[in-house]
Amino acid sequence: MVEDFVVTLIPEQDQASKHKLRKWAEEIDEKDRIEWISGITSDNRLIHIARRSRGGYGFGSGIDIGAINFSSPVIIEHIDSSYGRYNGFYGIEFIGGDINLVYPPNKAIDYTREPYGIQYTDPNTYTDIYNVELNEEKFRLIKTIDAHYVMSLGRIVDLSKNIKSKLRIELDQEKPFADLLKYHRYIRNLITFLTRISTNEFAVKLLTKDSIDGQEYYKAFANVRFYGDSSSVSSDTLTIQDVLKLDDIGDGIVDLFKLLNNDDKMPNLFFLPDSVKDRCSIKYTQVVDICSAIEIEYKLGRQLEGNSELKIKSRDLAERIIAFVDSIKTEEILKIKAKNIVGSTLKNYSPSLKDKIKFLYNLHKDGLEVVTNSYHFMSSFTDEKFYEYINKFTNMRHSTAHQKMIWNGGEAIYTHIMILIYFSIFERANIGKDIAIKSIDNGFKNIF
């Protein structure tokens, strides 16, 4: 039995079966592998239930019958009973919800026709196929729109529910069910970046390969549900003005998608709020997280050349100061102390958090000015004033290391810093400044 991702298993009513089920439930795998349990639903459809091997379990309501229960992170349910048994999938689709916002489905409608009925545009005008090589794997990322409609007996066709945008990942080789978590994470990272919230909504379907008259095609065979996914938290209040659009980014989606999912280069987006409602305020944890994001962008961005030059100059300066200290007649213990201080601060030069924010600001302030000038709710600052707020912001961040967060007004540039991080991510994805400005300018209309 499955209810709200809680799975209850009831063994056969003999002591051996009860003991075997409990022993299985108590097995622990430190690597936290996913184990799949398959069965048949009451309406004769296949279902696959994921269980984490490091997850806990509990006794069912009838302890005397040996029932156990556990929470499943993923449930796969076949669409109908006519489909065959599959041990894996050849593709995965992400449909509707927030994907409708980042890639509006109205592109499928031909608005130039006479208003005598609904006319659809050629699918080639709204379908793009991208070849992606990521983490030593090749697949196709497809951006398109489902423009078919479904008629239900006794009901009027609801086009708003049947015309949906979707992102599809197609694979040449069959993948095990455990891999769908990886592809789900890939798309979620992209949608999180575009919507600027971490709780997103979209439907997920698994695809298999089939053929008609020797012509191979992909078809959906199962629906997938993930524990913790939003059903209505985000999209009922999220609007098209809240998100960055795929059309603005264009073909840059490939490099952006790869950057957001590359283990060595991906940005830190933990500073983004969980939902639109959470945009109304800034939590102290977001200040800590956005500072971590700054560190990553500085480390992986366009700073290395200038930073290397500063390191060389700081080492040279340290050697001169140490030579000067050696020339002074005083106690040796004081000389050693002074040289240790110089050596630790200059020989191993590292810019401060304040320096890193200034660097990102000076690098992307032209784009930031375009965005801030577009919206009345965002303050514009002179360089001198912005530097003052950087001092306040970093002091606010450092206060968490010694006591609770001291809100000193530095949060006034929190959104500005977020925009600078977005510009840095676009640059690291090799997306031109003009495209980055257009994307951010169109996607940050409602910030708080």
Predicted regions and their residues:
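A sequence-composition feature that detects small, non-aromatic residues
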Residues: 16, 25, 50, 67, ...
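Short, charged N-terminal helix-start/capping segments
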Residues: 5-21, 29-32, 97, 101-106, ...
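Long, contiguous, compositionally biased segments that the model treats as domain-scale units
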Residues: 1-198
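Short N-terminal signal/transit or membrane-insertion segments
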Residues: 69-76, 80-86, 221-232, 322-337
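Serine/threonine-rich low-complexity intrinsically disordered regions
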Residues: 14, 29, 41, 64, ...
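Amphipathic, oligomerization/interface secondary-structure segments
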Residues: 231-448
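Internal, Lys/Arg-enriched amphipathic helical interaction segments that engage polyanionic partners
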Residues: 178-255
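Residue-identity detector for glycine
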Residues: 39, 55-62, 66, 84, ...
